[in-house]
């Protein structure tokens, strides 16, 4: 005997020719076991079978979004144009700062300046900023964006200052550049947050922001030390500290 649950919670004889008015389960007494099957037209198939994920059904929308033109990225997903542009801007920032630090390295490496510790510090700092730019380029490609390198401003070549001297003037410039870079990174993070891009936000937080704060703190201490020693013999001792103890930016 076959029974069907009615809408008013009453039981009636099963009519195989009748169309159910709503999705209802059907009880079938098959010899020694009770079988539950979906009634004709049932829309509650998942609840009856326990299936919560149907990959071949749900993937249809993603299949429609797969690019067919060779110029389009296959990896790109939930990566808006604003985020792509902001990453390219940050690449340009990192390269510009690297270029300035490289100019500072060349200045302090001159034979008539001969502050090898400061030269070493700024060379390592330049390499670090270039690595940051390359890391951003790799991320851009990973997300399916296009890297667009932009113009780099020609830096100064002379860094002596009549009142402060070259060492303090250069280190104050470095501190200002690190703070400016931090502002640019915070802007990139805000773009990611505004567009709900948690992957980009996490990338900026984990790879850049913490190190940037450490760099600002460290260079702030260098500025304070150089202000104490003035332009004289103390600069040579400071330079020797950088030369023998290291001190590149984070």
UniProtKB/Swiss-Prot annotation:
Disulphide linkage map: none
InterPro entries noted in UniProt: Ferritin, Ferritin-like, Ferritin-like_diiron, Ferritin-like_SF, Ferritin_CS, Ferritin_DPS_dom
Organism domain of life: Eukaryota
Binding residue positions for Fe cation 1: 94, 129, 132
Compartment(s): Plastid, Chloroplast
Enzyme Commission number: 1.16.3.1
Protein's UniProt name: Ferritin-2, chloroplastic
Source organism of the structure: Vigna unguiculata
């Amino acid at each position: 005997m076959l029974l069907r649950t009615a809408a008013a919670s009453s039981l009636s004889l099963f009519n195989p020719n009748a169309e159910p008015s709503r999705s209802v389960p059907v009880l079938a007494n098959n010899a020694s076991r009770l079988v539950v099957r979906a009634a004709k037209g049932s829309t509650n198939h998942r609840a009856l079978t326990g299936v919560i994920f149907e990959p071949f059904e749900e993937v249809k929308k993603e299949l429609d979004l797969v690019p067919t033109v060779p110029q389009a990225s296959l990896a790109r997903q939930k990566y808006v144009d604003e985020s792509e542009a902001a990453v390219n801007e940050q690449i340009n920032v990192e390269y510009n700062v690297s270029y300035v630090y490289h100019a500072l390295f060349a200045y302090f490496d001159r034979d008539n300046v001969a502050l090898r510790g400061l030269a070493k510090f700024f060379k390592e700092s330049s390499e670090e900023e270039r690595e940051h730019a390359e890391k951003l380029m790799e991320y851009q490609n990973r997300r399916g964006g296009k890297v667009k390198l932009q113009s780099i401003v020609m830096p100064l070549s002379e860094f002596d200052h009549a009142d402060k001297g070259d060492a303090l003037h250069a280190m104050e410039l470095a501190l200002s550049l690190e703070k400016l870079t931090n502002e640019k990174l915070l802007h990139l993070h805000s773009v990611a947050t505004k567009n709900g891009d948690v992957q980009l936000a996490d990338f900026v937080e984990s790879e850049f922001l913490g190190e940037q704060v450490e760099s600002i703190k460290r260079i702030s201490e260098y500025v304070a030390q150089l202000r104490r020693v003035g332009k004289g013999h103390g600069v040579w001792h400071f330079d020797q500290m950088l030369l023998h103890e290291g001190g590149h930016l984070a």
